[in-house]
Amino acid sequence: DIIAHGRPATQMMGFSDQLSPGQIEALVAHIQTPLEETPAWTVDDIQASRDMASGYTPAAKPTFEADPLNITLVVETGDHHVSVLDGDTFDVLDRFPTPYAVHGGPKFSPDGRFVFIMSRDGWVQKYDIWTLKEVGRLRAGLNSRNIAMSHDGQWLAVANYLPQTLTILSTDTMEPVKVIDVVAHNGTLSRVSAVYQAPQRKSFILALKDAPEIWEVATDPDAGPFHDGYVHSYEKDAVEAFGAQEGLFARRRIPVDEPLDDFFFDPDYRNLIGTNREGTKGVVINLISGGKVAELPLPGMPHLGSGITWDWNGVKVMATP
């Protein structure tokens, strides 16, 4: 039905006037055919793809007169370039090539000097705004969703559809630090719907697309322990449990009723607001307790990654495109 008649929420046109019912059925069958073997993309593969710019030399200060903290990036998806604009005059300071099909959510280092750009085919590019030069790039996945930077600017998380992993990169060296297989508590291998930074919590938050779970991955060396199952303790400091994770990149599982496709947070990052795959409702998950605290109708296909919350007449409200 979607191929034949389109989906208004995505501005996708229908193809019923170009494809016969038999052709549409064949196309659906092809799309739904699972891969015979899921391709791997390991730490070694990522490291081998790493390509640092040989002509890059860091500068002690910006090489242009504009305010380096008032820069606008224009992501040109049609021809795979990014334009760097002076935020005051909108003069073009540089225009540089990017990998194919760049995602429109570049991430800046805390000092605003470096920007990291991800393409849908898994390439991550590091660009130095001060020198207006590319630092380097590597391929963190084969089909990637988005990226997030840690609160301290040390780590970059890459959410992947293929393979089903979360890749952690060093923002300093552009080297892979860890590749986490995204496997739900019930053993389901899952794609990552999206990953975002939760700065107050010193963690990455990601939603699993194929399993009803939210993950919190710590960027704090003192995080945890996080337990996957029940914890049994008869006395103080005598915990009996299996599968606990703690420290840097420790994972905490938060079960939800159904998989979430997109989400965002309230201003203090205590609550996550997510939407289900069918686009019929939203849920509010408290990240401290891990429980659902509210449910609200969200028909259509809201893009919660661009949502916002604020206080209005003493009530906390939200808006999302």
Regions found by a protein language model. Name each.
Residues 1-35:
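Extracytoplasmic electron-transfer domains, predominantly the class I c-type cytochrome c fold
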